[in-house]
Amino acid sequence: MKVSVPATSANLGPGFDCLGLAVSLKNQVIIRPSKFHSVSLKGEGANNPALKDNNMFISIFNDFYQNLSHKKRFFRFEFQNEIPLSRGLGSSSAVIVSAIASAYAIEGIKLERDKLLNLALAYESHPDNITPAVMGGFNVACVQENEVKYINKPIPKSLKAVIVVPNRAISTAMSRKTLPFKYSKEDTIFNISHSSLLTAAFMSENWEMLKYASNDQVHQKYRMKQMPELFEVQKTALKEGALMSTLSGSGSTLFSMAYTDDSRNLEKALKNKFPHFRVFVVDFDNTGVKIEL
């Protein structure tokens, strides 16, 4: 059995804790019955032995599998990770979603996506991360009475994600501590209006509106101060043809969107100016979690 989950870019522009989308960097796990427990890990995080010894996927998988099956079995877990760790691309959400989906699939129990989404909420309280991981595409999401309420919109093939991944992380916990305890009425209105406009731009596919709608006063400028070169990355991306350029999650990755025809020039400009950072040009993912038995 094989399960894959896409990377996500959440806190999209002004959409703090409510807007997110999925891109086609994926984490994949193959699970096989075995006589004893074993783990192999390739790709991102392969050089970190702690991920084998203290694996969040296996912990969540075992909890669900034992509750569903009421028996103990051994498995071989083969991980192939494309999502950079601790860089604001939803690697934790991918682990949570894939672990729960795998436990149900191994037992042959059909799991509706909405139920999977709400089971994942117990481990990840921010719906802008887990919703695109499950559903793919662009998502507007909130939590109401312990359930995720969302609207999903596929993203056309004519657009690409251009992702700049710095060589160091920004801690999510530390990143949240940089945010103000209170916001002014002006900044609050700014973000409500801009997140509304950003949502409308995605839903109507008015891509030229993104450069205005993606502005933010609530979180990006505070978080990006921890890595000031991100301001220059953002400025360069917008100058070189990006439709929008925003911090991904809590950072340190910077996410940009561009027309397919412009994406390679944008990639080249970013690689030339920031050779110590990784730059990916990838499709958007409209599938979300995928299970192959």
From Swiss-Prot:
The entry's family comment says: Belongs to the GHMP kinase family. Homoserine kinase subfamily.
Higher taxonomy: Bacteria, Pseudomonadati, Campylobacterota, Epsilonproteobacteria, Campylobacterales
Cellular component aspect of the GO annotation = cytoplasm
Please indicate if the UniProt record lists Amino-acid biosynthesis as a keyword.
Answer: yes
**Keyword Kinase on entry:** yes
What this protein is called in its record is Homoserine kinase
| Pfam entry (one) | GHMP_kinases_C
Q: Which pathway is it part of? A: Amino-acid biosynthesis; L-threonine biosynthesis; L-threonine from L-aspartate: step 4/5
Keywords, A to Z?
Answer: Amino-acid biosynthesis, ATP-binding, Cytoplasm, Kinase, Nucleotide-binding, Threonine biosynthesis, Transferase
Gene3D superfamilies for the chain: 3.30.230.10, GHMP kinase, C-terminal domain
Organism of this sequence: Aliarcobacter butzleri (strain RM4018) (Arcobacter butzleri)
PROSITE patterns noted in UniProt: GHMP_KINASES_ATP
Kindly state which reaction or reactions the protein catalyses: L-homoserine + ATP = O-phospho-L-homoserine + ADP + H(+)
